[in-house]
Each structure stands twice: as structure tokens, then as C-alpha cells.
A protein has these predicted regions:
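Extracytoplasmic/periplasmic membrane-proximal domains and adjacent transmembrane bundles
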Residues: 10, 52, 123, 169-344, ...
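Solvent-exposed, membrane-proximal periplasmic/extracellular interface segments of envelope transport
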Residues: 5-7, 62-138, 196-217, 238, ...
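Signature of alpha-helical transmembrane segments and their immediate interfacial
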Residues: 1-38, 432-434, 500-548, 588-589, ...
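Transmembrane helices with small-residue packing motifs
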Residues: 16, 24-62, 106, 120-129, ...
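Hydrophobic transmembrane alpha-helices and their membrane-interface caps
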Residues: 30-35, 347-414, 472, 865-954, ...
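Helix-loop junctions and hydrophobic alpha-helical segments within the transmembrane domains
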Residues: 324, 331, 335, 410, ...
Length: 1021
């Protein structure tokens, strides 16, 4: 390499400038570290949009055919569409648009624009009376701060006034995003009529409505231009309260009636209730607060806490303000834990360096660590990468790898100093002999993480910073090793270094003995290694599989699913029973309850649920992880024993993309009745498996319908239409909006309906008296018949086919992926017996895992190509490239040996770690093979070149392996990183041993190198 540019030599000749660069790098790193955003988990894009449409009065079938199907059909034109899922109830359509998991996050805003445009194109084809469609393309917004407001002795309206006041005041907090209220109940003024009394008086309820609307109308009365002035004319008559309504005199049928004489007027809350919210069992109103995108959650959280403290101090006695969820607090604790683990890893790596290299050499390596970290922090700040679970874990993993280059440089300098060279000569030679093999090894290691970086799935987006941080750390570590480490080494290392004892120590002799045995008995060594590899492949079936582990947060989610015809009042009663059970539990810190809806998205991977009167969700915060486990078991047993007929599910929070119940099977087909029949058959089969928890359907039960068949000819003779009858029945049963009362910032609906005694029974309709246009009262049954029918209250569809999803939890410690594998023969057999057009598809954890792993598999060829290219650039030999690569799969032996005894599952993150192992293992192998080449060029015989190169590289290879594996100990105890850490520690240790034993044996076998006889040994140069 004479005549080529030597970066280390340049650094030594420009030391002042290099020291300046180091100082600037450290200074920038410190400032970047302080400015980095903090998060608990990396963000990823929820690639889902919700389209909601209402068509009051329509049946479920009409809504499905005229609204839902039209929207679904149009959405099929989207190129990036994965599937459409819809939920149709009478008069209500909800369509979920799911984009392909590989859709780029930056393309999603444009795709949502296209969705708006496509639906706008078909608005003219929708039936009259449609409300919407409305679009929610912010489905993934996270409301990290949630407060509960309770009022002791206050009405819900009074409490809401205070919450609205706080809501308005916190708008001044910097970085505030969306703010939503939870559980507020709208006030309503009810006009409760007696249908019998109105009929006896000959009063048509529609006349009452028209009179009230006319008086309460807000209509311009004009403006007078009086010379230089403009005078607005105003009329009175608008209602300001229920008292104004009571005093109204109505002229009906040429007579005057006081409204209070023909209707009971009361002010209350919407009935049936809207979704309810409670805190620790007390009715409450929630205030959910989201931060603006890209903000610093800790800075925002601090500002929000200060403002909330100021505001709550001014609230009257009786108003309680409670923290339900505090993302800033969670992030501070999580990042604090991750940062502690990072510093633990730094200390471990430093200890390894000092023990193995000695004080001076270890100090050179120690100085390189903060330089690399500082430059990585600068990169993170300018690329928008925050400090969170994945990026900090990546730094910990990188720590053990980034010291490799510095160790190799220092080792080579010491070797040359032992030979009597000056420190400058030693540093220059270190670059000449190791810089490019190190760079090749670094690039190969980075290539091992490429499947993570180019994985376009949501899981890949979640773990992307793992690739970005490690790749930059590795590249920066090479620059530090060849630019900064030589300068530091020249100032720290001793000028005279005594040569190491030629005789190796006990460990060295053991390694040498093992290496020589392997080389002399090469086929035995190769055979044993291959046998171990085959055994490890076979043993992989005994390793448990998972997608992402459960979160290590203390929250527990408890879902209650009542029969789908249940009212919100029945759901509330079930919640009352459960809250009575948990209220005195010593393991619970607090809990919040959502009745008629799921929890607001306070945590990004939350599997958010739709509003449904038969559904409730409790978010219970336990006092710790041990308490969480015990509490889950107790709740599962209590719900199973005491809540028969109510579907329940108890789970900790998830990590990664949301899944919900882990075991899911979708039964789909053309005919709803047949789909229901097959779903019940499949559920019966699944129920025989003892590992499955409670099985529920997302829909299944038909509901009662009271059908009124109107004899149209008779109705027309009476001057009545179907619309007249339907409106009257709606006003009697559910209540119809009459007008509105303006009350401060609120609009209070005035609703006319039948009195309680009449409204609550079906007989009311059968005995209903209809007032005709001429004022006579006619029984409904005179021109109509009333009968009961069964109707599907709701229908879920997927890709325009009715689809029932069977969902279940896992009862024991078995992993969902393994259970699905166990159930596969049963599902396949059942699927084969279904009629044409009907099928069962597997969803849940297995489906989401497949979506995440599919893109990885597609990128692996690119990873292998990059590795092969880098190796060929360095080795210039196809044979040596295959020799080096042959060691890479052997890391699987260590992976299996680490996972099976510890019972650690193989998850998505562990798979990424195994792929990364390939690059790490090849890195050591390429440096060893390059060293063999150098010894051969120096005049050693092929046998001695292999022996000497292995002996020479043994120490640095073992040191880097120790640093890489021991450095991951702090994250091995983490729920998220544990599987990856165990897999990589086991893989690195075993692969390192095989690099020093198997690779020499394979090398001499491949090149047919024989051990020379003693009298034929060449002199060592």
C-alpha cells in the first residue's frame, strides 16, 4: 500500500486539528444529547382510516347495500389498499380502510387525500337523507396525558363547565395538539307526552313541534338605515330555559293549550346515555390531551403539569382532578431505565477493555467510546431520532461492536511497539494493515442490519432506528479508530513495550491445543460442527415463537363484551359488579372505566375499540409487574366464574403493532346465515383445545325487530303516509328533536317523546292512536299490523364479504404462534370441508407476524449481495468468500443453546438479532482470513500461516466477543430486548469459538494444506 493515502499518518501530522475535531465532536454530542426528544417507544404510522356515515331510519340491510357497499366498491380502486373492513348497523355505516403494511409513511397523507376524493366522486349516488360520510384519518393520534375530573356534590353539567374552562385555558401550553373530552353527557330538555291524552284532545304532536319551532326560530328581522346609523332589529321569543317552554301557550285546533298542561317538561341528560367514563368507580369527565407531532414529550409534559397545577388550584372544593395517564412521566421513567442500562453497558465494555488490554491500551479504547457516542447523538438529533426503547437498545448493542475497531488498532500498535517501532510508525502501520479489513468487517456488519432498515412493514417502521443507530455507530467507530485512536494512542501508550511472553497461558494453550487438534482432524472437526448445526436446526422446533412481547408497563386492560343486543344500562350494571370486586384490591393503584366504548388511545400500540353499548373496557394500573401478574390471574378466574355469559379478556398492554386477542380466525362467505353456521361449527371445534381461553365472536346474534306493516291504501285514505307513521313512532319510542335552547356555550336539544310508562313497552305501539290531518284519532292497528321478526343488528364485512371473526386468548404460558401451529391441522381439515365460496383465514398474532417478516425475507437477498460484494472487494477470491461465509450460519447453534434452556421465545426482534449475527460473525472471519493471507505473504508456510494468524487474532477476537456479549447483559433483563440479547449473546460466543476452531480446520481442508514434518518447518519471518 506504499504511496496510498494513510489517514492515520495524516492525523498524526495534523494533531492540533484532530484534537480540535475531537473537542468539537464531544461538545456537539453533549448538546445533542440534551436536545434529543424522549419517547417510551418509537412511533409508527397507523395505516388506517375510518369513514362513518349515518342514514337515520334505514334498516341494516338497506344501509349495507346502499351505503357500505358503495363505499367499499369505490375503495377497491386504491392501489395501496390492503383490505376494507366494514361494520354496518341500522342507519349506521363504519368503513375501515387498511393500507398495505409496506406503504411508506410519507405517502399516506396523499393516499388519504385520494380516499376523500374518491368518496366525493360518489356522493351523488347515495340515498337522500344521508349524513356524511365523515373521515377520520387521525386514527393513530396518541393522547398521552389523560385527566379525570370528578365532582363531589356537583351535577354533570356543573362539572362539565369546569372541564370546559380548563380545556380553554390549557390552549396556551406550548406544543399542545388535540384535546378531547371523554364521558360528557349532553343535557336534554324532555317533553314527555301521553299519547292517549294527545289522542283524546285530538292534538297532533307534529302541530306542537311546528309551533315551538316557529317561535324559537332565529330569523333576521332586518336593519334600519337611519341617517348616519345602522340599527339592527331583533325579535324576542327564543327559549332560554325549560321554564320558558313550560309557559308557552300553543294554539292547536282553534284552542289554546299551555305546553306544561299537555306535556311533562324536565331537564336531564341524553337517554340512553352516551359512552360513560369513570375514575376509580366514580362518574367522571375525562380530558385527553395530545402533543403536537415532533414535540419533546418531557418538555411538553412539564409545561402541561405546571399549567394544570395552576388551573386546578382555582377550582372549587369538590372538584377532583386525577391523573389517568401521564406519558411524560412514563417516558421519563422508561428513558431513565434505558439510559441506566446504556451506562451499565459502557462500564462493562470499559472493564473488559482495561482487564484485557491493560491500563494504557484500555484507556485509548475508553476514550473512543464517548467520541463515537457523541457523533451518534449528533446524527440522531439532526435526523429526528429520539431517545426511546429501540434507539437506546441499539446504542447498547452497538457498544460491544464499536470498540472492536479501536481494540484492533490498539492491539496492532502494541504489537509493532513490541517490535521496537516508534509510536508514530506503529500507528501508521496499524492503518496500513488493518484499516481496510476493519472497514470491510464494519460494512459487512452494517449489511447484516439492512433487513431491519429496509423492512417497510409497521413492525419495520417500529424498529427502524435499530438499523439507523447501529449503522451510524459502526461507521463512526471505524472513523474514530483510524483518525482519533492513533492520535490518542501516541499520547497515552508507552514508547517502549515489553514483548509478551512467547509462551501462551493456560487458556491460550487450551485454545492452541483445540485448534491444532481441529486442523489435524479436520474432517472430524467439520463433521462435529455440521452435526451440531443440524441438531440446532432440528431443535428450533422446541423454541417458542412470539411476535412482540407484552409491555412492561403496569397497566392491565379488561374487556367486557355483553350479548350484542344488550343496552348500555346492562353494560353499566356488569361494570358495577366488577368495580365492586376490584375497589379494595391491594395490588391496584387506580383504574379508569370506559362504558360503551374502548379506552382512548393513550398508548400508540393500543388496539382501539369502536363505540358499542354492549362493550366496556377498564384500564387498571397495578402497583408493579409482580402485582400485575398476580392481578391478571385473579381477574381471569373471577370473571370466568362470576360473569357467565359475558365475554371477558384480561391482558397487559402490547408492544409493537396492535393485535388484540392473539388467536383469531375469520370465517367468510356469501350468505350471512351460512357464515354464522360455519363460525359456530369452528368455534365448537376450537373449544376442545384446553390451551384456548374464552372464545367470542365479533358478531353473531340476531336481534328482535318489531315490524309495522302499513296497509298503504287505507293509510292514504286517512291522509297518512309511511313517513308520518314512522316519525310519530320514533318520537314516541326514542324521542324526536323539537328545537334547541341556547344555554351559554351549549345547545340544549328539546326532545319530544312518550312518557316513561308508555315508552318502555312494545304494547305502546300496538295501542298507539294516530291523529289524522282532519283531527280524528285512529288506532294504528286500524290500518297496520305489528309483528316480531329477527334481524341481524350488525354485520362485519371484510373485502365485501360477510365475515365473522372468532377470537380467543391463550389460557396458559403457551405462545400464540405455537398454539396456532398446533391448531393448523384442525383448521386445514375444516377449511377443506367448507362449500365453495366459504373459507377460514388465520388472523391475530400469526397474521401480523407474517406481515412483519415477509418484507424481511424479501430484503435478505440484498443483504447477502452486499455482504458478498464487500467480501469480494477485500478478499478477491470466491473460495475465501465462501469460507468466510460458511461460519455465519453456525451462530444458530449458540442461539438455540441460549434460548431453549432459558425458555426465551423467538420473537420478531430476536429474528432481527439473528440476521445481524451474520454480519458480526463474518466480520471476525474476514479479519482472520486476511491475517492468514498476510502471514503467507510474509513467507510463512500455509500451515504455519493458519496457525500463527489464528493465534495472533485469537486475543482481539475473544476480546471483541466478550465486549459484544457482556455489553448486552443490561438489556437481557428487558422484556423487549431479552430474546434478542440472549440470541445474540449465545450466537456470538459459539460463533467466536467456531471461528477460532472450525474455520482453521475448514481452511486447511479446503486448500488441502498438510502439517509439515518437523524437519520441514520453515523459519518464521
Amino acid at each position: 500500500m506504499k504511496g496510498s493515502f494513510n489517514l492515520s499518518d495524516w492525523a498524526l501530522k495534523h494533531q492540533s486539528f484532530v484534537w480540535y475535531l475531537m473537542f468539537v465532536a464531544l461538545l456537539m454530542g453533549v448538546f445533542s444529547y440534551m436536545n434529543l426528544g424522549r419517547e417510551e417507544d418509537p412511533s409508527f404510522t397507523i395505516k388506517t382510516m375510518v369513514i362513518q356515515t349515518r342514514w337515520p331510519g334505514a334498516t341494516q340491510e338497506e344501509t349495507l347495500k346502499q351505503v357500505t357497499d358503495r363505499i367499499e366498491k369505490k375503495l377497491e380502486e386504491l392501489d395501496s389498499l390492503d383490505y376494507v373492513k366494514s361494520y354496518t348497523r341500522p342507519g349506521e355505516s363504519t368503513v375501515f380502510v387498511f393500507l398495505k403494511d409496506t406503504t411508506s409513511a410519507k405517502d399516506i397523507p396523499h393516499i388519504w387525500y385520494l380516499v376523500h376524493k374518491k368518496i366525493d366522486d360518489i356522493r351523488g349516488s347515495f340515498p337522500q337523507g344521508l349524513q356524511g360520510p365523515s373521515f377520520n384519518d387521525e386514527f393513530g393520534d396518541v393522547f398521552g396525558s389523560v385527566y379525570a375530573f370528578t365532582g363531589d356534590g356537583l351535577s354533570m353539567r356543573q362539572l362539565r363547565d369546569y372541564v370546559e374552562q380548563v380545556r380553554a385555558e390549557i390552549r396556551s401550553v406550548p406544543g399542545l395538539g388535540k384535546v378531547e373530552m371523554i364521558g360528557q353527557q349532553d343535557e336534554v330538555i324532555y317533553l314527555n307526552f301521553s299519547t292517549r291524552k294527545l289522542a283524546a284532545l285530538g292534538i297532533d304532536q307534529r302541530q306542537v313541534v311546528q309551533s315551538l319551532q316557529s317561535q324559537n326560530a332565529v330569523t333576521p328581522a332586518g336593519v334600519i338605515e337611519a341617517g348616519p346609523e345602522r340599527i339592527s332589529v331583533r325579535t324576542s321569543g327564543q327559549f332560554a330555559s325549560e321554564k320558558d317552554l313550560a309557559d308557552v301557550n300553543l294554539r292547536l285546533n282553534d284552542r289554546f293549550y299551555r305546553l306544561a298542561d299537555i306535556a311533562e317538561i324536565s331537564r336531564g341528560y341524553v337517554d340512553p346515555a352516551r359512552p360513560l367514563f369513570r375514575f376509580n368507580g366514580t362518574p367522571a369527565i375525562g380530558l385527553a390531551i395530545a402533543m403536537q407531532k415532533g414535540g419533546n414529550i418531557q418538555a411538553f409534559g412539564k409545561a402541561l403539569h405546571e399549567r394544570m397545577d395552576e388551573l386546578t388550584a382555582d377550582l372549587p372544593v369538590g372538584v377532583g382532578v386525577h391523573k389517568v395517564s401521564d406519558q411524560a412521566e412514563v417516558v421519563e421513567e422508561a428513558v431513565g431505565g434505558f439510559t441506566s442500562a446504556l451506562f451499565e453497558a459502557v462500564i462493562i465494555v470499559l472493564v473488559v477493555s482495561f482487564i484485557s488490554l491493560g491500563m494504557r491500551a484500555g484507556l485509548v479504547v475508553a476514550c473512543s467510546i464517548p467520541l463515537v457516542l457523541a457523533l451518534v447523538f449528533v446524527f440522531m438529533e439532526y435526523s429526528g431520532i429520539t431517545m426511546q426503547r429501540v434507539s437506546l437498545g441499539a446504542l447498547i448493542i452497538a457498544l460491544g461492536l464499536l470498540v472492536d475497531d479501536a481494540m484492533i488498532t490498539v492491539e496492532m500498535m502494541i504489537t509493532r511497539l513490541e517490535k521496537g517501532e516508534t509510536k508514530e510508525q506503529a500507528a501508521t502501520y496499524a492503518y496500513t494493515s488493518t484499516a481496510f479489513p476493519m472497514l470491510t468487517g464494519t460494512l459487512v456488519t452494517v449489511a447484516g442490519f439492512v433487513p431491519i432498515g429496509l423492512n417497510a412493514s409497521s413492525a419495520g417502521e417500529y424498529t427502524f432506528t435499530l438499523f439507523a443507530v447501529i449503522a451510524v455507530a459502526m461507521l463512526v467507530s471505524w472513523v474514530v479508530a483510524v483518525l482519533f485512536a492513533p492520535v490518542i494512542g501516541v499520547h497515552i501508550l508507552s514508547a517502549k513495550v515489553k514483548p509478551h511472553d512467547a509462551e501462551p497461558g493456560r487458556i491460550g494453550r487450551a485454545f492452541n491445543g483445540g485448534m491444532l487438534w481441529a486442523m489435524r482432524n479436520r474432517w472430524w472437526a467439520i463433521g462435529i460442527t455440521v452435526a451440531l448445526f443440524v441438531a440446532s436446526v432440528f431443535s428450533m422446533q422446541f423454541v417458542q415463537n412470539q411476535f412482540f412481547p407484552s409491555s412492561d408497563r403496569p397497566e392491565i386492560l379488561v374487556d367486557l363484551n355483553l350479548p350484542q343486543n344488550a343496552s348500555i344500562n346492562e353494560t353499566r350494571k356488569a361494570v358495577d359488579r366488577l368495580e365492586a370486586i376490584i375497589k379494595d384490591d391491594p395490588d391496584i393503584a387506580r383504574w379508569s372505566t370506559y362504558i360503551g366504548q374502548g379506552a382512548i388511545r393513550f398508548y400508540l400500540p393500543l388496539d382501539q375499540q369502536l363505540e358499542n353499548p354492549y362493550y366496556a373496557q377498564l384500564v387498571i394500573v397495578s402497583k408493579g409487574l409482580e402485582e400485575r401478574s398476580a392481578l391478571i390471574q385473579r381477574l381471569q378466574k373471577r370473571l370466568r366464574d362470576d360473569f357467565v355469559g359475558i365475554g371477558s379478556y384480561v391482558q397487559p398492554l402490547e408492544m409493537g403493532p396492535p393485535v388484540g386477542r392473539p388467536i383469531q380466525y375469520r370465517v367468510s362467505g356469501k350468505d350471512i346465515d351460512q357464515v354464522r353456521k360455519h363460525a359456530i361449527e369452528l368455534a365448537t371445534l376450537l373449544d376442545q383445545n384446553t390451551h384456548l381461553g374464552e372464545i367470542i365472536y365479533d358478531w353473531n346474534e340476531p336481534g328482535k325487530v318489531l315490524r309495522v306493516d302499513i296497509a298503504q291504501d287505507k293509510a292514504r285514505q286517512l291522509g297518512l303516509s309511511s313517513e308520518d307513521v314512522a316519525q310519530l313512532m320514533n318520537s314516541v319510542v326514542s324521542g324526536a328533536s323539537v328545537t334547541q335552547v341556547h344555554d351559554d356555550i351549549y345547545l340544549i336539544n328539546v326532545v319530544g317523546r312518550a312518557e316513561d310508562a308508555e315508552r318502555g313497552t312494545p304494547e305502546t305501539l300496538q295501542n298507539l292512536q294516530i291523529v289524522t290531518p282532519n283531527g280524528t284519532s285512529i288506532p294504528l292497528l286500524a290500518f297496520a299490523t305489528v309483528r316480531y321478526e329477527l334481524e341481524q343488528p350488525l354485520v362485519w364485512r371484510r373485502d365485501r364479504k360477510p365475515t365473522i371473526t372468532i377470537k380467543a386468548s391463550v389460557r396458559d404460558e403457551m405462545q400464540p404462534t405455537d398454539l396456532v401451529k398446533q391448531l393448523a391441522p384442525t383448521i386445514d381439515k375444516f377449511n377443506a370441508g367448507l362449500p365453495v365460496g366459504y373459507k377460514v383465514a388465520t388472523g391475530g398474532t400469526v397474521e401480523e407476524s407474517g406481515k412483519a417478516q415477509g418484507p424481511i425475507a424479501s430484503v435478505v437477498p440484498l443483504m447477502l449481495f452486499l455482504m458478498a460484494t464487500f467480501l469480494m472487494i477485500q478478499l478477491h477470491s470466491v473460495q475465501k468468500m465462501f469460507l468466510v461465509a460458511s461460519v455465519a450460519p453456525l451462530g444458530l447453534i449458540g442461539v438455540v443453546l441460549a434460548l431453549i434452556p432459558t425458555g426465551t421465545p423467538m420473537g420478531f426482534v430476536a429474528i432481527l438479532g439473528i440476521l445481524a449475527l451474520i454480519g458480526i460473525i463474518i466480520r471476525n472471519s474476514v479479519i482472520l482470513v486476511t491475517q492468514i493471507d498476510e502471514y503467507e505473504v510474509a513467507g510463512y508456510s500455509p500451515w504455519d500461516a493458519v496457525v500463527q494468524a489464528t493465534e495472533h487474532r485469537r486475543r482481539p477476537i475473544l476480546l471483541t466477543a466478550a465486549a459484544a456479549s457482556l455489553g448486552m447483559i443490561p438489556i437481557a433483563r428487558e422484556v423487549f430486548w431479552g430474546p434478542m440479547a440472549y440470541a445474540m449473546i449465545g450466537g456470538i460466543i459459539i460463533a467466536t469459538l467456531l471461528t477460532l476452531l472450525f474455520l482453521p480446520a475448514l481452511y486447511v481442508a479446503w486448500y488441502k494444506i498438510r502439517e509439515p514434518k518437523p524437519d520441514q518447518q520453515e523459519k518464521r519471518g
